[in-house]
């Protein structure tokens, strides 16, 4: 393959996407080149609009448009008494697609970890504020069954101890080390249905 700088750079960028390596990236680039008008132009335009207008909501963690605000917390048409807390937006999408939860979502933006992610970096304070502001009755913790996910869940439980909300956590249906976005609908359903009440374990 000839060294064309623009092509090489595009292949490098695409190969950084999840699940894609250099070979897959090359196939995608060839598909784009062979469909310049149908794919390249609209893709470039859409990516430009996403870059300019789509950001992360600083309150709930969801994606929002700078043109219309956040439909997850600012402009939600529905009123709920439950919030499901997840680590990232991919987890929210997985749960939404499974149709097992009707309520608000709160995206933390990661987990507390020993490699630099601090609790101050996560949207935990705004979660407490939402629980009080929206009169939330139940907070469902849907963090991953990893050490970091469980550490984060227990810290959130402690942060919510002075609220009236019941705090529950996904149950044994969630395999140890399992990440939410990789679970099938059946496993998610079992984990939600058999979730554990953490309030009873509080002092």
Language-model-derived ranges and their functions:
Residues 2-7, 16, 26-84, 88-92:
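Cys/His-rich Zn2+-binding cysteine-cluster or related metal-binding knuckle/ribbon modules and their
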Residues 13, 17, 35, 50, ...:
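Conserved, well-folded catalytic cores of nucleic-acid-processing
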Residues 24, 128-203:
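Long C-terminal interaction/binding lobes of large macromolecular proteins
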Residues 39, 44-47, 58, 71-72, ...:
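Core recognition of P-loop NTPase motor domains used across DNA-transaction enzymes
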Residues 25, 75-143:
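Extended interfacial segments that mediate partner engagement and assembly in macromolecular machines
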Residues 18, 37, 50, 63, ...:
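Conserved phosphate/pyrophosphate-binding and hydrolysis machinery centered on Walker-type P-loop NTPases
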Residues 8-12, 26-30, 41, 45, ...:
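Solvent-exposed alpha-helical segments within well-ordered globular domains of core cellular machineries
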């Amino acid at each position: 393959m000839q060294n064309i700088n623009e092509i090489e750079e595009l292949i490098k960028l695409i190969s950084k996407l999840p699940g894609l390596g250099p070979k897959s990236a090359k196939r995608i680039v060839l598909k784009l080149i062979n469909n310049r008008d149908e794919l390249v132009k609209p893709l470039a335009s859409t990516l430009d609009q996403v870059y300019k207008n789509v950001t992360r909501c600083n309150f709930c963690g969801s994606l929002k448009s700078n043109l219309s605000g956040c439909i997850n917390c600012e402009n939600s048409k529905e009123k709920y008494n439950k919030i499901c807390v997840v680590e990232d937006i991919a987890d929210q999408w997985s749960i939404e697609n499974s149709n097992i939860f009707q309520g608000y979502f709160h995206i933390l933006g990661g987990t507390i970890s020993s490699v630099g992610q601090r609790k101050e970096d996560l949207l935990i304070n705004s979660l407490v504020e939402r629980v009080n502001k929206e009169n939330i009755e139940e907070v469902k913790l849907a963090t991953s069954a990893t050490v970091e996910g469980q550490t984060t869940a227990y810290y959130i439980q402690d942060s919510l101890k002075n609220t009236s909300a019941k705090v529950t956590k996904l149950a044994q249906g969630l395999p140890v080390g399992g990440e939410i976005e990789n679970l099938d609908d059946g496993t998610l359903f079992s984990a939600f249905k058999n979730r554990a009440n953490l309030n009873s374990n509080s002092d």
